[in-house]
């Protein structure tokens, strides 16, 4: 058994206990995050800015709207693989820190079979959730249409809402019950999507509570940290106009994006980033470690 509260606070605990080692994550995550921004600007920056400006005018013109969406397709083609790599390395590092702490390497960061398996798990889980959502959404639509034909629009709306809530509950159940797939795959050294389902039997509500509490803590921490960053930007930049340039930057080019204030903000945001990430990522391996203590799961 595990404590939902302990799991929810595991990110804070790991951050405190491994503070010095995690300092190495600051420049690494900072460089990776900056690289993501550069990719966005290089591959789709001008197009995204143009799309923002043209969106109201193209709403009634499907051809123009489709043309405006081209930058998004180019962006996804680059960002999705990059995010898989980024989070594959990140999740493997957190799992290594919590489940194999003696294997420090470069502050637990590496790139090898463990990271590739994490990427595979993300892809497979993403496909699973997409298929379940797609099939469920089609079923809800058919049910609502059949109800409308048989009993009228009012009843169909009610049935559609209830069926939609049931689909949402199914997706949440899947997400919670399969949430240990990453940790289990790392610990066993083989891709295992559904072993988590058996492992979490009887623990759904404590796990859901732990994840919800961790999410609330993460939101509070993010608000506190970025309120401080906003205050610094306003103070140094001389007013709210500086903050506007930071939170709504001009992505037309690298030169227009990386202004002095944006660079200052990015550098400051690098510092808390690893510790904020731990709040959301650590609960799952913490729960896995507790549930498998003394076993070979």
Regions found by a protein language model. Name each.
Residues 1-13, 52-67, 83-152, 177-204, ...:
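Membrane-interface segments at transmembrane-helix boundaries
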Residues 38-57, 134-148, 227-244:
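Membrane-helix interface motif
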Residues 144-163, 236-252:
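Membrane-interfacial helix-loop-helix connectors in multipass membrane proteins
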Residues 60-67, 198, 240-264:
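Short, membrane-exposed interhelical loops at transmembrane-helix boundaries
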Residues 1-49, 167-238, 265, 297:
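Nonpolar helix-loop interface/hinge motif
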Residues 22, 26-34, 80, 84-85, ...:
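Alpha-helical transmembrane spans of integral membrane proteins, capturing the lipid-embedded, hydrophobic core
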Residues 34, 38, 68-103, 154-190, ...:
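Selective recognition of hydrophobic, aromatic-rich stretches within alpha-helical transmembrane segments
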